[in-house]
């Protein structure tokens, strides 16, 4: 059986050797060129391939059509991926008749995504493992072929666990590869309800928060110990790294971050103390804890801290227009949780952001973007990243007020885009899933899918075409005048503070809010055209995390990109959403305070929205760009989102009733 292998790291070397030992013919190996900035402590797949006399390649983009054709020429019977860092396109996965298979460093479906080795230690797990699974379009989601468990000892650190996983991988492959070679390939579907996803880790994620439990801090030290970048803290402006530690249960009443003693070197955490066994000051050498204390000039009672605010770059200034809206207020919370962001915002109200008004890094002005143009231009010039989130985005308004939709959603936002061009500021612009219109693709691709809308006499498309035209204008400004931009397309984000029940009372709300209002008031749930339209519902927490990563823009990977942000796994019809909501409503502890359920009522869309409305049957995103550019994957199940959204609205009603 002929194989093409994609491999990197020690796991890649183990995989290549196991495939050879099982009697496969390896036609070619694809790997990565080593990054000079990375600590390459691991084995070289390219060197191993060269020593074995196997053709080896390291293309920048293995999914380019030229390389896909080249791989096809090898005519592989089977494809293996062993710690190859890039996702393989469906075109490549379909080249091998027997299929494509990936070795993942966890017990799937737990710990899908990046850096599972480190994450299991961060989370204090006692067991992990390796899994060989069939590769499908979605990362780490294919049927399981085989897995092997690995116990995590309390003294395991990243490197010792890495060696255990390599050994387990070799044992697993030695056992299953001969069976697969004979055509006997086990397939066990993964349980999506058990799936968890973790993103990439960065060196800065090693910053210690001394207010966490001591076990959490100790687990972080274990998870990123050498040769990984290490867990670190600061004494004044001096950074130091902790390479090994142990837990001491008694913090002696000291405040978190306080030095309890210097020999041994112990630091108080939330519920105990961390003893620093070895560490390193700055770029110095590794020394034992008491010597580290001496080098840093520590004394008992000293307080360790987060990186000083004056340690270099100023904070990143983010301008959010529409800051009081659903996305704006949740994004503000996420940004203010990071020390290096300052938020400037404008909106016509402040009810959703009242909790931030006294925050020292939040600056709010109540105003209208169509009136306060001077304030906006000044702050576009002042800030680093601009998010124009103001838009009319409820379907009934498209047919009620199409001209107002165009004036606000297109004309006012175009003025802001031109300010960004003028002052050369980066803009993160909210496009919409509506731009795909009546696209017939099974999933909507940002770079390939056609954008199809209905006739001119259907004003419901005014929002879609206004957003689409702005997308095209922004793209042209990027191509012709160097505007730095990212377009993101939310797919049916839901969560607390989505809109209001008052908006639902006048028909100007999202679907779930309207459904909740029906339950609260004891009126029939209206299913427009039977409620068979399908959407992919996305938890606001998943959406905001993706949007935050767009703002961070690691490696400038988001520049010039269009990125769908949605959850393809949470596809449901409006009727199914209503049924799930009703079930959650009946189980809610406040259910007894509301009227009986009044049933479902099928309503024709024309009578509800007017003659200018037209609906679409489905709207499912491809999220390959989000995975590739952001290292992001949605993880929150639709039921959890529905329950949390319902709880928010029911408790807000309860508070109002008690107040009256």
Swiss-Prot record:
Entry annotated with the keyword Oxidoreductase: yes
InterPro entries tied to this protein: Arna-like_SDR_e, Bifun_polymyxin_resist_ArnA, Epimerase_deHydtase, Formyl_trans_C, Formyl_transf_N, Formyl_transf_N_sf, Formyl_transferase-like_C_sf, Lipid_A_modif_metabolic_enz
SUPFAM superfamilies tied to this protein: FMT C-terminal domain-like (SSF50486), Formyltransferase (SSF53328), NAD(P)-binding Rossmann-fold domains (SSF51735)
Residues annotated as site: Transition state stabilizer: 102
Record's keyword annotation contains NAD: yes
Region ranges (Dehydrogenase ArnADH): 314-660
NCBIfam families assigned to the protein according to its UniProt record, in alphabetical order: PRK06988.1 (NF005414), PRK08125.1 (NF005998), PRK11908.1 (NF008872)
Subunit structure: Homohexamer, formed by a dimer of trimers.
Protein name: Bifunctional polymyxin resistance protein ArnA
């Amino acid at each position: 059986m002929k194989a093409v292998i994609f491999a990197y790291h020690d796991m890649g070397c183990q995989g290549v050797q196991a495939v050879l030992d099982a009697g496969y013919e390896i036609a070619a190996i694809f790997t990565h060129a080593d990054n000079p900035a990375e600590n390459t402590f691991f084995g070289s797949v390219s060197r191993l391939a060269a020593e074995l006399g196997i053709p080896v390649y390291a293309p920048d983009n293995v999914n380019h059509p030229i390389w896909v054709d080249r791989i096809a020429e090898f005519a592989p019977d089977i494809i293996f991926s062993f710690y190859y860092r890039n996702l393989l396109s469906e075109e490549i996965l379909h080249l091998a008749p027997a299929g494509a298979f990936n070795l993942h460093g966890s017990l799937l479906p737990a710990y899908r995504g990046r850096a599972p080795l480190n994450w299991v230690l961060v989370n204090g797990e006692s067991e992990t493992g390796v899994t060989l699974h069939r590769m499908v379009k979605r990362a780490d989601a294919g049927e399981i072929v085989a897995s092997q468990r690995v116990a995590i000892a309390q003294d395991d650190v990243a490197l010792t666990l890495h060696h255990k996983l390599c050994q387990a991988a070799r044992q697993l492959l030695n056992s299953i590869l001969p069976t697969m070679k004979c055509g006997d390939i086990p397939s066990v579907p993964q349980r999506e309800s058990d799936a968890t996803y973790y993103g990439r880790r960065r060196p800065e994620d090693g910053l210690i928060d001394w207010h966490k439990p001591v076990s959490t801090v100790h687990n972080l030290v274990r998870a990123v110990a050498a040769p990984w970048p290490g867990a670190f803290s600061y004494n004044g402006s001096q950074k130091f790294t902790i390479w090994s530690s142990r837990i001491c249960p008694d913090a002696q009443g000291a405040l978190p971050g306080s030095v309890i003693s210097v020999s041994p070197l112990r630091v108080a955490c939330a519920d105990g103390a961390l003893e620093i066994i070895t560490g390193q000051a700055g770029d110095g050498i590794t020394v034992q804890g008491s010597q580290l204390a001496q080098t840093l000039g520590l004394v008992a009672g000293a307080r360790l801290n987060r990186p000083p605010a004056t340690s270099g770059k100023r904070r990143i200034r983010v301008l959010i227009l529409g800051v009081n809206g659903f996305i704006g207020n949740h994004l503000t919370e996420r940004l203010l949780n990071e020390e290096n962001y300052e938020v400037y915002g404008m909106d016509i109200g402040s009810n959703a952001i009242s909790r931030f008004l006294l925050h020292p890094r939040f600056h709010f002005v109540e105003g209208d973007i169509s009136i306060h143009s001077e304030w906006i231009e000044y702050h576009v010039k002042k800030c680093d990243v601009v998010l124009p989130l103001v838009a009319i985005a409820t379907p009934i308004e498209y047919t009620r007020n199409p001209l107002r939709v165009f004036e606000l959603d297109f004309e006012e936002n175009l003025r802001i885009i031109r300010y960004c061009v003028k002052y050369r500021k980066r803009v993160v612009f909210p496009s919409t899933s509506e731009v795909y219109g009546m696209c017939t693709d099974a999933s909507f691709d940002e770079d390939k899918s056609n954008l199809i809308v209905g006739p001119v006499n259907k004003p419901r498309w005014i929002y879609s075409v206004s957003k689409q035209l702005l997308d095209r204008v922004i793209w042209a400004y990027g191509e012709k005048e160097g505007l730095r931009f990212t377009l993101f397309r939310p797919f049916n984000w839901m969560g607390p503070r989505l809109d209001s029940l008052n908006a639902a009372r006048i028909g100007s709300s999202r679907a779930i809010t309207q459904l909740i209002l029906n339950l609260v008031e004891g009126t029939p749930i209206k299913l427009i055209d039977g409620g068979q339209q399908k959407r992919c519902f996305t938890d606001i927490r998943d959406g905001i995390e993706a949007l935050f990563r767009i703002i961070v823009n690691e490696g400038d990977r988001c520049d010039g990109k269009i990125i769908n942000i949605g959850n393809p796994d949470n596809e449901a019809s409006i009727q199914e959403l209503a049924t799930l909501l009703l079930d959650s409503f009946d189980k809610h502890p406040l259910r007894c305070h509301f009227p009986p359920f009044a049933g479902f009522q099928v309503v024709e869309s024309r009578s509800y929205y007017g003659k200018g409305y037209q609906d679409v049957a489905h709207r499912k995103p491809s999220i390959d760009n989000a995975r590739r550019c952001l290292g992001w994957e949605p993880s929150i199940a639709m039921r959890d989102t529905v329950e949390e959204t319902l709880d928010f609205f029911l408790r807000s009603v309860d508070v109002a009733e008690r107040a009256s």
